[in-house]
Amino acid sequence: MTIFAASVFDATVIFEDKELFKGRGAASVWAEKLAKEIESPVTVEKIGTGWALRGQVDGVDCTWGILGQRLKRIT
C-alpha cells in the first residue's frame, strides 16, 4: 500500500480552500513517511494557519495537503 492510500486521521485546518495539518508534529511524521515513499527529502512548511508538506518529484517542486483523509498534491 502506498502512503497516498493511507488514511490521515490527524487534526486539520482549512486555509484558502486547502486542508492542511493543524500541527507541525503531525506534519513532520507524514513528511518522513512521504520522503520514504518518493525517495526524496520532504519538509514541512507553515501556510497560513496550517502546515503543508514540501518536496520535489522528478525535479518539480510539490506541495501536499489533505483531501478526504488522504494526502493530495495541492501544487
Residue locations for each model-derived region?
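Short aromatic-glycine-(Arg/Gly/Cys) micro-motifs in beta-strand/loop hairpins
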Residues: 1-16, 47-54, 60, 66-69
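Alpha-helical interaction segments
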Residues: 11, 19-21, 40-42, 54-55
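A short, charged, amphipathic alpha-helix used as a generic interaction element across diverse proteins
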Residues: 22-41, 75
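Hydrophobic beta-strand residues in large extracellular and virion-surface proteins
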Residues: 27, 31, 42-44, 53, ...
